[in-house]
Design a protein with these regions (language model features):
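Positively charged n-region of N-terminal signal peptides that target proteins for export
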Residues: 1-6
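Boundary at the C-terminal end of the N-terminal hydrophobic targeting segment
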Residues: 22-24
């Protein structure tokens, strides 16, 4: 009888011991270990998630002049509005992915340069690290602008969608001009003459 009792106590003790060891091996998020494990780089998030979801929003409303006259393009059916809503939601949530710490700007050896004055990935990373709060603020501005597109989509208001799309573009430009090409004066020059983000001439000046 005593042997069985001792065996039972021994078994319980081992169970507690292994439980303590297992608990000790779990990551302690409260001590600074991140609960997130980012895999994609910022460049990959931009090309794989941001661009494919923001372009349909920007292109959803337009005016095309032809020999036959002017063609107004805007979402018409519930299905078209629903498709745009999915893009807006994805854009809202990717803003959260952008601010996860530990995410590199680009993969080793990758070329991020799309403008003459753009910094190297290493220098962009340094700039973000030096002004983390500013980077997060820009990401939140993108999310706020994307929320405006969602509100316009839910209201099925094409005019408001155009305005919100311009604010999304402005948020993107603000972040890139601050961290990717801080020495590039072209966005400022185009704005100084009264052009707004989304204007075709603005984009020509921006990409020239």
């Amino acid at each position: 009888m005593m042997h069985k009792t001792f065996l039972g106590i021994y078994t319980v003790a081992l169970g507690i011991l292994f439980g303590v060891v297992a608990y000790a091996q779990k990551p302690d998020v409260s001590k600074g270990e991140s609960a997130y494990k980012p895999v994609a780089t910022l460049q990959e998030l931009m090309s794989s998630i941001v661009d494919p979801n923001v372009d349909p929003i920007w292109n959803s409303v337009s005016t095309i002049s032809t020999k036959e006259g002017t063609i107004e393009k805007k979402p018409q059916t519930d299905e078209e509005w629903l498709a745009l809503r999915k893009h807006a939601l994805t854009l809202i949530e990717v803003s959260n992915l952008l601010v996860i710490e530990g995410r590199p700007v680009a993969a080793s050896g990758a070329n991020t340069s799309s403008h003459v004055t753009e910094l190297s990935p290493k220098d962009i990373q340094k700039a973000i690290h030096a002004n983390r709060d500013g980077f997060v603020k820009n990401a939140h501005a993108l999310q706020d602008a994307a929320k405006l597109t969602l509100a316009a989509i839910d209201a099925k208001d094409a005019d408001e969608l155009v305005k919100a799309g311009g604010k999304v573009e402005h948020a993107c430009e603000q972040c890139h001009s601050q961290f990717w090409y801080p020495n590039d004066k072209r966005p400022t020059a185009s704005l100084d003459i009264g052009l707004k983000p989304g204007n075709s001439l603005y984009m020509k000046m921006r990409n020239s």
